[in-house]
Amino acid sequence: MDKINYYLLFVITITLCVITLGAYVRLSHAGLGCPDWPGCYGYLVGIPDNSLEIIAAESIYEGSKVDIMKAWKEMIHRYLAGFLGIFIFIISFIFYKKSSYNLFKLSFFISLFVIFQAALGMFTVTLKLQPVIVMFHLVGGLIIISLLWLLFLRYNSNSFFEKNSFYSKTKISKKEIKSLSILSYVTLFFLIMQIMLGGWTSTNYAALACVDFPKCNASWWPQMDFYNAFFVELATNLNYEFGRLDSPARVAIHFTHRLWAIFAGLIIIILAFKSYKLLKVPYQKFLSLILVLLLFFQILLGVLNVKMSLPIYIAVLHNGNAALLLICLVTQLYFIYTTKKNI
């Protein structure tokens, strides 16, 4: 691999760290550790950490109590995200200098998306954890890591396909690859919807709305309020920390996340099975197995979240594994798409 490959993998690794750190900040209730943005109680570097600074900060930001641990968690996440943004802008510059037009277009789009993601980060704080903003901020991070991984795949397309004679080894008809391609896009839709439901569950503090498994509160169909569960409240003067929904609405969110997981899981298994059967290249078969393993690990983590009352390390792993599952599916989809285009 050349230096660009190593740099891309480095940036992807940092992105995964930012995603998991963001999950940790949210799950440790540090999302409002700093009431302003981009600084923390007016400090761009550091936080108020002595008694005089804390008194001054609390007098300026009425209603806020300085929690040093929460403030540092939030600021470390912001600093790391800021460095990540710079690293991604450098990627665009690299492909611009190399005159790699198609790769530059994708990297430039990622750079623009990073700016949008930063704006969502700001609104997450200024709108006091408004659930729809927090959910899209979570999904935005997963989109960024998926696009960076796609950029890595496209940069290495020659070594992945031509050098390994991928197409000559793939004995598959146009009809078969077309059906596989459609299935892969449908699977991507189901997984993204499941991730969004997971984000909605987390941002509405509904992860423990069902306290048992496989039943929900000792019932196969508990009392639920679907209308309020998925009603998007756009009030800008409310504090959404710890959630504002009543129990039936939170149960409806949690239960929907479980139900959709069944459909998403089944379609991922079907895609993996068909890919394993139809694509004859060894690393394609390996990729199908990895997809299924990540799926079952994700299910296990989801069950443990409920059974163990949401331990933070399990919940953070659940978020990080979702990113890996999405990356794996994007890889599968890219190989299927490229095979279809070249047959």
Where are these regions (language model features)?
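Membrane-interface helix-loop-helix junctions at transmembrane boundaries of multi-pass membrane enzymes
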Residues: 2, 93-108, 176, 272-291
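N-terminal signal-anchor transmembrane alpha helix
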Residues: 6-38, 189-201
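Small-polar-interrupted transmembrane alpha-helices in polytopic inner-membrane proteins
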Residues: 10-21, 105-123, 186-194, 286-304
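Interfacial helix-loop-helix junctions of multi-pass membrane proteins
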Residues: 24-34, 118-138, 201-212, 250, ...
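Extracytosolic (periplasmic/ER-lumenal) interhelical loops and adjacent juxtamembrane/interface segments
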Residues: 30-73, 207-249
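Membrane-interface loop-to-helix entry segments
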Residues: 72-89, 132-144, 252-270, 315-324
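Membrane-interfacial alpha-helical segments at the cytosolic side of multi-pass membrane proteins
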Residues: 82-96, 143-156, 263-276, 325-337
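Membrane-interfacial, low-structure loops and terminal tails that flank and connect transmembrane helices
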Residues: 157-181, 341-343
